[in-house]
Amino acid sequence: MMGNMFGSSLASLFFLWATIQQIFPNHLKIAIKEFFLSTIQQISFAKRFSDKFINFFSPYVQINFSEYEDYRVNHAFDPIETYLGAKATDKAKHLRASQVRESKGLVLKRDETKVRDEYEGIRVWWEMETDSAGYKTLKLTFHRRSRDIVTNSYIKYVVEEGKSIDAKNKKMKLFTNNPSSHWGSSKTSFWRYIDFEHPATFETLAMDPKKKEQILNDLAAFNNGKDYYKKIGKAWKRGYLLYGPPGTGKSTMIAAMANLLNYSIYDLELTAIQNNSELRKILTATSNKSIIVIEDIDCSLDLTGKRKKKESNLMIWRKDGDQDNEENKSFVTLSGLLNFIDGIWSACGQERIIVFTTNHLAKLDPALIRRGRMDMHIELSYCTFEAFKTLAKNYLDLDSHPLFSKIESLMKETNIAPADVAENLMKKNRETDADGSLNDLIESLERKKKVQIAQVDEHKEYSNKIVEAFRKLF
């Protein structure tokens, strides 16, 4: 009796499935099929035969591409999303428009969650799903008879095409890390970002021309060094230490590097990281072709080279107002940071530049900045006359002027940051002319000269008093 009922039900299911195959479009068929199979699997009698049912009724295979996998960015996700976004925009009903910097036209992309694609005579379906936390998964569905073509050829094709489209329309991004207290699961984004559109270039950078050329040559060698780094057995990365007084152009230099190489920037805030494990997680979630920046590293960590023995080489900092709260301490060891710079973990990624900046080079631990770890030390000091001429060209469109000689003489005697020079040269209003801007700079230089002379005299007087006091003692 039960066998007859089951046979009758099975015949009905066959008829229903055949009808669905004929009437409904593919995406709807797949959705109905999923509901149909899940219903069958709830029937106790059918559980023993569920695999056979699924194989019979579901000839489709599904591959999921999550945005994040095990705390790391899934590097296949973005190229696939780009490829699908650009797919047949002339036929799509919903589009997204954006404009890349220095591009004359708009970049149009699909803004639909479902896309059908064809490749070498086979048909596949893509669907984008977003969970409650906002993290995305791309689902690829195809017939099982196409498995070999899809897995061996199609996916690779899609990723390469997506990368090619990205290279043409790439938007650089400026990332900053989320506090570790906001990391909820392995899918949580460690970084948030905005589009990076800084105008700085090496052409507009105010610095000694010879030093500028040296940096450009070094960056070019790095950018073209894939085979060389592989040959010598080193990770394809480069470290730069930028040091000098405030206002000398360290942040501008980083922006110029990014624009030159078309790299995104990861601005790493170390005080938001609790320990070495979190440091590894967040750094392995960065992309290739990027610049990882730790600005004012002497302020971020205790790297003065005078760590107390009882702290066992431990760098400690506390959030403001939490000095007495043990739970709010953040711990990162020097070895943990160094391990990512040039240890085993440094190989996790390619084409990466690591930049440290500091206003106080002498405060840093020698182990952090030794040659080979930070490959190039770049001093960005006070404004020279050559740097001034670059700024004068940028701000006033001047190659020469009668006041240049006086400015050159004052700059030999006075320390002034390039940022201060730029502030004086910038036109305050429409009536300000070149003469007015240059005279403003001369006045600023003369004021600084007086202050610096007074400071020198004060220092000499103080030193003389100390010497005299010692003479009286002995």
UniProtKB/Swiss-Prot annotation:
Entry keyword DNA-binding: no
Q: Which UniProt keywords apply?
A: ATP-binding, Hydrolase, Magnesium, Nucleotide-binding, Signal
Q: Which residues form a coiled coil?
A: none
Q: Which reaction does it catalyse?
A: ATP + H2O = ADP + phosphate + H(+)
Protein residues bound to ATP: G244, P245, P246, G247, T248, G249, K250, S251
Q: Does the keyword Mitochondrion apply?
A: no
State one molecular function term (GO). ATP hydrolysis activity
Which positions carry the signal peptide feature in this UniProt record? 1-25
Tell me the enzyme class.
hydrolase
- Describe what upregulates or represses it: Induced in roots by salt stress.
The record's listing under Pfam families reads: AAA, AAA_assoc
List this protein's GO terms for biological process: response to salt stress
- EC numbers, comma separated: 3.6.1.-
Q: Which cofactor does it need?
A: Mg(2+)
Show the CDD domains listed in the entry: RecA-like_BCS1
Q: Which protein family is it in?
A: Belongs to the AAA ATPase family. BCS1 subfamily.
Q: What is this protein called?
A: AAA-ATPase At3g28610
